[in-house]
């Protein structure tokens, strides 16, 4: 079957490319905020719903006319910023999520997405470069090859200052061989999860080491003069430590979910209301640490890819 897979690479833009990326982040944030304000104003004045197409037309006809510098960045990036705003707006109405917030330039994670058209995005594994709209060829660490059709590229900068690009590819995926083994999963706090046949997936102990480093660095930061050179150096160390924890955890979850999906045809787990549970301050950190949401998310899409059945049951369902 054909599936969408994302391949994430670290990129090393030169000074000119970094300026263009920063400009695109800023323009996307500006367009997101302006179209959100426009949508809010129309609804308050006329009680009319505004579609994402209306917002896109408003950007092209009004905003680009008033703010010429918007034409200096990739047009697909601006359109996708509007579509992201629309998705947040739809979530507010359909899923009763919080009302979309205006984006701040102080956000730690910055990103924009551009679409593939007429070969404007290309990955060259021989030269180790990625071609992107308005950036030309950017140096990259291309550690994984892929085959398939590029659909989009998301350029991001994390709080440690590193740049990445995530290439979304439509690729053919070979399903795993059928198995007659079925399993139930009990999500835990002491351990990540325990399967119905007694297998225990422990929480990673190595993360504790980095969490201790984090506490030490945060203590150091509180003693630094704000906006001093050492303050920013320590902030960067904290960001790198967070990144290390995030990467170790995600890599481990991929290994666990792959093993569970490979060995079982039907996988059953509890349908936990994680958002509500995180509101309990005594449980919040423990739940975030064991990453239930990310594990169940991975099990869900990997089951679809491999012809497996993943079922979430009510927490209080009497399985006996």
Predicted feature locations:
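Gly/serine-rich nucleotide phosphate-binding loop at the start of the catalytic core
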Residues: 1-78
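Generic detection of short hydrophobic beta-strand segments and adjacent strand-loop junctions
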Residues: 9-11, 137-140, 200-203
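Short, surface-exposed charged micro-motifs
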Residues: 10, 120-122, 152-155, 182-184, ...
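TRNA-binding/sensing appendages of the translation machinery
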Residues: 11, 85, 299
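Hydrophobic (often cysteine-bearing) scaffold residues that line and stabilize catalytic clefts
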Residues: 17, 21, 28, 74, ...
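Short, Φ-rich (hydrophobic/aromatic) sequence segments
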Residues: 28-39, 81-89, 93, 214
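Acidic carboxylate diad motif detector
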Residues: 54-158, 289
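Positively charged, helix-rich recognition surfaces that bind polyanionic ligands
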Residues: 144-146, 159-320
């Amino acid at each position: 079957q054909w599936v969408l897979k994302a391949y994430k690479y670290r990129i090393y833009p030169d000074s000119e490319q970094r300026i263009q990326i920063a400009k695109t982040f800023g323009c996307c944030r500006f367009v997101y905020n302006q179209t959100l304000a426009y949508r809010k104003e129309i609804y308050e004045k006329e009680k009319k719903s505004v579609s994402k197409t209306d917002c896109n037309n408003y950007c092209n006809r009004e905003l680009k006319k008033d703010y010429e510098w918007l034409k200096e960045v990739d047009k697909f990036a601006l359109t996708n910023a509007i579509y992201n705003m629309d998705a947040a707006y739809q979530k507010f109405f359909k899923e009763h999520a919080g009302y979309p917030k205006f984006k701040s330039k102080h956000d730690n994670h910055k990103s924009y997405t551009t679409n593939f058209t007429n070969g404007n995005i290309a990955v060259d594994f021989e030269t180790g470069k990625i071609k992107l709209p308005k950036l030309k060829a950017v140096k990259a660490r291309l550690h994984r090859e892929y085959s398939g059709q590029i659909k989009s590229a998301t350029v991001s900068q994390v709080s440690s200052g590193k740049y990445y690009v995530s290439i979304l590819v439509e690729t053919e995926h070979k399903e795993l061989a059928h198995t007659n083994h079925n399993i139930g999963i009990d999500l835990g706090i002491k351990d990540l999860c325990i399967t119905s046949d007694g297998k225990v997936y422990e929480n990673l102990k190595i993360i504790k080491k980095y969490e201790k480093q984090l506490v030490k660095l945060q203590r150091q930061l509180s003693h630094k003069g704000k906006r001093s050179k050492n303050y920013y150096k320590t902030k960067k160390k904290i960001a790198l430590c967070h990144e290390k924890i995030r990467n170790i955890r995600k890599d481990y979850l991929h290994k666990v979910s792959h093993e569970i999906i490979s060995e079982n045809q039907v996988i059953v787990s509890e349908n936990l209301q994680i958002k509500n549970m995180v509101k309990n301050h005594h449980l919040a950190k423990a739940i975030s640490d064991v990453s239930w949401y990310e594990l169940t998310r991975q099990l869900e899409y990997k089951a679809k890819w491999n012809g497996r059945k993943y079922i979430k049951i009510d927490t209080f369902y009497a399985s006996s």
